[in-house]
Amino acid sequence: RFKKIRRLGALPGLTSKRPRSGSDLKNQLRSGKRSQYRIRLEEKQKLRFHYGLTERQLLKYVHIAGKAKGSTGQILLQLLEMRLDNILFRLGMASTIPGARQLVNHRHILVNGRIVDIPSYRCKPRDIITTNNKQRSKALIQNFIASSPRQEELPNHLTIDPFQYKGLVNQIIDSKWIGLKIN
């Protein structure tokens, strides 16, 4: 993980740690001129590592975004941001996206009252995301919410009730609230 964030810059979904400022300067001195190919490759790798996708998954999302009307890049980011694991991360119910994936895989999360164990589940507006009624599930989410003070404000497409451990997807994400800076 640290090699990835040193090479690509801060990836908030992958880890909460930040690259040291000195290592960034060394990389820039060593690299020389950046070709268009290298820039596109780095941006693609940022997307992959931030959202925890394989190459094949990312290509499927690009294909879906290409078929839809509108800007392919914006639609791609909207598709990735509306994944269940990413929404749990944005709500503060998990410290990282891999942590959110684990919560979903271990069946701690309900969407509209049903257990969902697929991290790539595409959330829709008016979806209600809650924890399982088991004591262990509530304790896990409570620890995440208590231990992670919200550095950034909650995006306007999400609302959370931290006392009931419930989140709500209000609408599809707006482009200004996307957490990753992509060229």
Swiss-Prot record:
A Pfam family of this chain: S4
SMART domains in UniProt: Ribosomal_S4 (SM01390), S4 (SM00363)
KW Kinase (keyword) present: no
One GO cellular component term noted in the UniProt record for this chain: small ribosomal subunit
Subcellular location, record wording: Plastid, Chloroplast
CDD domains: S4
MF annotations from Gene Ontology: rRNA binding; structural constituent of ribosome
Domain S4 RNA-binding: 82-143
Major subcellular location class: plastid
Gene3D superfamilies: Ribosomal Protein S4 Delta 41, Chain A, domain 1, RNA-binding S4 domain
Keywords: Chloroplast, Plastid, Ribonucleoprotein, Ribosomal protein, RNA-binding, rRNA-binding
Family: Belongs to the universal ribosomal protein uS4 family.
Free-text function comment from the UniProt entry: One of the primary rRNA binding proteins, it binds directly to 16S rRNA where it nucleates assembly of the body of the 30S subunit. With S5 and S12 plays an important role in translational accuracy.
Name recorded for this polypeptide: Small ribosomal subunit protein uS4c
Native source organism of the sequence: Freesia sp. (strain Lejeune 1997)
Protein's gene: rps4
